[in-house]
Amino acid sequence: KFCERPSGTWAGVCGNNGKCKDQCIRLEKAKHGSCKYKFPAHRCVCYYEC
């Protein structure tokens, strides 16, 4: 099971799933990452093992 947490290193609107995922894994030691709509814009969200 994965828990999601907004990226702490991504700035601005998320428009590239691949870059978001790479940044979550590389910089934040997450297992996965993707762009997800959180009002008012798409944000980079990182996924960790709970």
Swiss-Prot record:
It is found in: Secreted. Keywords: Antibiotic, Antimicrobial, Disulfide bond, Fungicide, Plant defense, Secreted. InterPro entries: Defensin_plant (IPR008176), Scorpion_toxin-like (IPR003614), Scorpion_toxin-like_sf (IPR036574). The keyword Disulfide bond applies. The keyword Disulfide bond applies. It comes from Nigella sativa (Black cumin). Antimicrobial peptide with antifungal activity. Coiled coil: none annotated. This is Defensin D4.
